[in-house]
């Protein structure tokens, strides 16, 4: 099952690891993340997950990449996309969007035309005793 994304992610960092054949939902295997002589880990090709009972490494493709490379979720997702079939296609980066909240002291030039500012509640009203 070397064509599975979870197997490709593990083989990227541990090329000597042998993926187990796909017999069950969770297939026993030797853990590549620590020295292992008896199978203490399991990989699921259906769920695209990995779990080691001995060292505690578990997760999906992105969490394994984050564990090994110590990168953010977005960077791990880009790496995982390159591991997938047809991974030679460059990943499109979205342009940074302008934040929707206005910063204190920022001009109101972006206000739509024809609108007037809202008066403040009590301070805009005359007091009855003046």
Curated annotation (Swiss-Prot):
InterPro entries: DNA_primase_Znf_CHC2, DnaG_primase, Znf_CHC2. It holds the Pfam family Zn_ribbon_DnaG. The keyword Zinc-finger applies. It comes from the Viruses. This is Gene 58 protein. The keyword Metal-binding applies. SUPFAM superfamilies: Zinc beta-ribbon (SSF57783).
């Amino acid at each position: 099952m070397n064509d599975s994304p979870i197997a490709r992610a593990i083989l990227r960092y541990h090329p000597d690891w042998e993926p187990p054949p796909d017999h069950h939902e969770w297939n026993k295997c030797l853990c590549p993340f620590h020295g292992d002589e008896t199978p203490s880990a399991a990989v699921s090709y259906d769920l695209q997950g990995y779990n080691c009972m001995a060292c505690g490494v578990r997760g999906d493709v992105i969490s394994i990449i984050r564990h090994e490379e110590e990168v953010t979720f977005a960077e791990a997702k880009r790496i995982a996309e390159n591991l997938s079939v047809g991974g030679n296609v460059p990943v499109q980066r979205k342009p940074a969007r302008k934040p929707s909240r206005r910063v204190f002291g920022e001009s109101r030039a972006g206000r739509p035309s024809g609108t007037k500012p809202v008066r403040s509640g009590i301070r805009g009203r005359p007091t009855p005793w003046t």
